[in-house]
Amino acid sequence: MRAEIENYVKKIEQSLELLWRSLDVESSTERLNELEELTSDPSLWNDQANAQTLLREKSNLEEKLNAFNKLKSNLKDTLELEEMAEAENDLETLSQIEQDLKNLSVIAAKFETECLFSGEADGNNCFLEINAGAGGTESHDWVSIMMRMYLRFAERLGFKTEIINMINGEEAGIKSCTIRIIGKRAYGWFKTEAGVHRLVRISPFNAAGKRMTSFASSWVYPEIDDNIAITIEDKDLRIDTFRASGAGGQHVNTTDSAVRITHIPTNTVTQCQSDRSQHKNKAQAMKMLQAKLYELEMQKRTDSVNEQNAAKTDNSWGHQIRSYVLQPYQMVKDLRTDYETSDTKGVLDGDLEDFVSASLAMNAGGRR
């Protein structure tokens, strides 16, 4: 077996071994058989809430076990083909097998990461909000770089994106933006990216070519679906409308279509100006508000256990999660997991999978 092929095979086999333990395949298969019996009972729908819960559990187990078995089967079939190609010294087929195994190793690594998703909202779409820290134009430019990085990351994962809100900087860059990320498990993939990000580089805006440090914060919250109940009273809301504006203060349109919603008890604010319809902007802003309030509630539960406050307050600016050093050397380092890479270009182009995997594994107690 050629060295490159052997390396990919080892990676996939290691992933399969970890997945076998993580999924607890034997117990999960037994539970799936049990769920199939329960959900085939006609009396199941006498309790609709319980029926929905059981069906979601069944669907989740089916998806994971099918993916595991498909991965295992694909590896077996590819190894059989590789054995025949080796015997015939079929270089063209061996080259294709190497590429197939490379692709399979990527799928295995992604599946391995997704098995660490455990939150009730991990499978949902999400919103990503990025805000500039102190530093003016330098920080505004850093927000625009981060926005591009996350758009590329979403694209790598096969997610769709919508820019819901964006406020441009006075000279360059972006003061703040909100992106909606659409796809299965989007929140699971993005949730560990919340925190403060520090950039060190030679400033393109400084004539003396000085090295500058910039900060920006990101906040991630899941889009709420019908399975999660969030109650918002009308009396707790203040709704303002205003004209959506573009760069340089120029109006995108001449109607008050942009909407800002304030949840008075928590002082949580959302706004949307992505559509010309005030009605659609209001609906999107309400979705974002539900998502933010859900995330705040989850943070309260976490705080009661960890005595940490990771909610979006001024203190969160001290919660630095990652540094991106471009000069005098090149290094991106996660300060929570100590995972680091010198491939700064790759990271800023959206190669974040290893950072996310390391964070999820740490949160799960080191399982990986």
Swiss-Prot record:
UniProt xrefs under InterPro entries: PCRF (IPR005139), Pep_chain_release_fac_I (IPR000352), Pep_chain_release_fac_I_sf (IPR045853), PrfB (IPR004374)
Keywords carried by this UniProt record: Cytoplasm, Methylation, Protein biosynthesis
GO cellular component terms listed in the entry, alphabetical order: cytoplasm
The UniProt record lists the keyword Iron: no
Mod. after translation: Methylated by PrmC. Methylation increases the termination efficiency of RF2.
Pfam families: PCRF, RF-1
Span of the signal peptide: none
Transport recorded as keyword: no
Single GO molecular function: translation release factor activity, codon specific
Cell compartment(s), UniProt: Cytoplasm
Gene3D superfamilies: 3.30.160.20, 3.30.70.1660, Release factor (1.20.58.410)
Main location: cytoplasm
Residue positions, PTM N5-methylglutamine: Q250
PANTHER family referenced in this protein's UniProt entry, alphabetically: CLASS I PEPTIDE CHAIN RELEASE FACTOR (PTHR43116:SF3), PEPTIDE CHAIN RELEASE FACTOR 2 (PTHR43116)
Family: Belongs to the prokaryotic/mitochondrial release factor family.
Full protein name: Peptide chain release factor 2
Organism: Rickettsia felis (strain ATCC VR-1525 / URRWXCal2)
